[in-house]
């Protein structure tokens, strides 16, 4: 959290909008999890307060309890292919994944789908131990136009923060995703 708090002002000064920052932090809810996300949300709010950025920011949700599953399955299909439209039927976790992760978060405004998918790749890469999901999200990134060279550049930028082992694992997963 300390490095994040230190770098956030520079990011805001160089084009990252407050909405993009908040959406990136919110995206972490479904990957590292709420417990790991909360300190970053608190740090974000503190930096925003120091910079006189008014809170709360305008809402970015686009789904309701009634349509979140449908919209989430549509987002999954756009990222991973049409076979994902029915994947939510394969168990309760799959249903939660479609409705919550993809329906509640991926459908929000403030970041576009390729940005969200790249951010998800970064969360999985930094977390470690998620290689099957990292391979899937490497493919998802490429399906959305974040080509292999771009993803390699993203891994390279993350290396000082996550270390060589996780960076090398991410490159290996990217290679598997392109086979």
Question: Residue spans of the language-model regions?
Answer:
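Helix N-cap / loop-to-helix initiation motif
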Residues: 16-19, 112, 145-149
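Short alpha-helix boundary/capping elements
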Residues: 1, 16, 32-33, 123-130, ...
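Substrate/cofactor-recognition hotspot
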Residues: 23, 27-35
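Short, glycine/charged-rich beta-strand-loop motifs at protein surfaces that mediate ligand recognition
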Residues: 109, 122-128, 141
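Acidic, glycine/proline-rich low-complexity segments that act as flexible tails and inter-domain linkers
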Residues: 2-13, 36-114, 135, 143, ...
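Short, structured motif recognition centered on aromatic/hydrophobic residues
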Residues: 4-8, 24-25, 115-125, 134, ...
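Short, charged low-complexity intrinsically disordered segments located at boundaries
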Residues: 20-26, 54-59, 150-154
